[in-house]
């Protein structure tokens, strides 16, 4: 997919997801245990919105799912395993730079006994340790 029609915005191997197009990527895989994983990507937010659009979602069923969404101008990382919430993090960092790209890395270990060890979020290489909500 190409951004806009302008070649200046054409970044090799990049994707642009426009909600009006209902575009998405999918991968069906049985690799791994689904309890420990990492997700890494570059993102550029195009504007402020009060909705909670999904950046990434994956689910086996309604009781086993993971999602990364926009929560107003923050990111939210959420995981439900066996019907129990294992991860729900909303870092305090706000995304208000609509011109720049941001690197995000999310790691999860839903088997960890201590809730603070279950998930970590890095934004532009900085571990996020201040949260508006962490549960």
Task: Describe each model-derived feature in a short phrase.
Residues 41, 99-110, 121:
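Short tryptophan-centered beta-strand motifs in secreted/extracellular beta-sheet-rich domains
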Residues 116, 123-135:
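Short, solvent-exposed beta-strand-to-loop segments that form ligand-recognition rims
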Residues 76-79, 121, 130:
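Short hydrophobic/aromatic-rich beta-strand segments that constitute the beta-sheet cores
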């Amino acid at each position: 997919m190409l951004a806009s029609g302008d070649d200046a915005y054409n970044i090799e191997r990049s994707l642009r997801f426009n909600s009006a197009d209902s575009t998405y990527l999918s991968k069906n895989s049985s690799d791994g245990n689904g309890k420990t994983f990492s997700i890494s990507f570059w993102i550029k937010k195009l504007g402020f919105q009060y909705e909670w659009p999904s950046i990434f979602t994956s689910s086996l069923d309604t009781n086993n799912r993971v999602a990364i969404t926009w929560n107003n101008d923050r990111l939210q990382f959420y995981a439900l395993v066996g019907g129990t919430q294992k991860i729900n993090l909303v870092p305090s960092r706000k995304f208000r730079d609509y011109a720049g790209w941001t690197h995000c890395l999310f790691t999860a270990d839903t088997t960890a006994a201590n809730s603070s060890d279950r998930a970590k979020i890095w934004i532009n290489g900085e571990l996020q340790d201040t949260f508006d909500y962490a549960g």
